[in-house]
A protein has these predicted regions:
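Conserved beta-sheet core of the metallophosphoesterase superfamily
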Residues: 79-170, 175, 180
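Short acidic low-complexity segments
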Residues: 64-79
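Glycine- and charge-rich intrinsically disordered segments
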Residues: 181-187
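Core catalytic region of metal-dependent phosphoesterases/phosphodiesterases
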Residues: 1-66
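Short, well-ordered coil/turn elements that cap or connect secondary structure elements
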Residues: 29-31, 62-63, 77, 102, ...
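Acidic carboxylate-rich catalytic motifs and surrounding loops in phosphoryl-/glycosyl-chemistry enzymes
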Residues: 36-41, 72, 167-172
């Protein structure tokens, strides 16, 4: 059969920016501190416009109170590293757990666009795949290419204090707590 033109059912760059604005403004209105790290798609935009990630966010949002990292990861407190990986895996949290072992901190990661947690027996470390903040049907390479990617899932994390982490799912309208983790000592 004839294939549809991906432009007919994937979002334009402008509509993707509108989604991003919506998500960031939503989080900013809900939480006192919101950390944002760039990912692989942001690097394309940064290179194209020859702008830093912070300059892109500032231009896109105008005035905001987001905490923008120039790096693809950040360390929070002494027990948590959060960031965007270069690779992905179909097992939620597996790559995050490998990062957790490497950094000796619990790890929360993006890039695989799925939610879930991984740990091993007797380990004090958690590896968590956060999910994504996107409209899955609008992602060109997911819809228009022949691939084995698992279904994308939206999610994020809320660090309530130094040791309490809520893993959240979000369908664009409703937020739900998927799991609450107590982040104990990692040593």
């Amino acid at each position: 059969g004839k294939h549809k033109n991906p432009a007919e059912y994937t979002a334009s760059s402008e509509s993707e920016l509108q989604y991003m604005r919506h998500y960031l403004k939503y989080f900013e209105s809900m939480f006192s501190e919101v950390y944002v790290c760039p990912g692989n798609h942001d690097r394309w935009v940064m290179n194209y416009f020859e702008m830093s990630f912070k300059e892109i966010i500032d231009t896109m949002l105008g005035e905001h109170n987001l905490i923008i990292s120039p790096y693809e990861y950040i360390t929070i407190n002494d027990n948590l590293v959060v960031g965007h990986l270069e690779e992905w895996n179909e097992t939620p949290g597996l790559l995050a757990w490998k990062i957790a072992k490497q950094f000796r901190r619990h790890a929360l990661v993006g890039h695989d666009h799925i939610r879930g947690m991984y740990t091993e027996n007797n380990s004090k470390l958690y590896g968590v795949s956060l999910g994504a903040c996107l409209v899955p049907a609008n992602i060109y390479y997911k819809r228009a290419s022949f691939n084995s990617f698992p279904a994308f899932q939206n999610g994020y994390a809320v660090l309530e204090n130094k040791n309490s982490l809520r893993l959240m799912s979000w369908d664009g309208k409703k937020t739900a707590v998927e799991k609450t983790l107590i982040l104990g000592s990692t040593q």
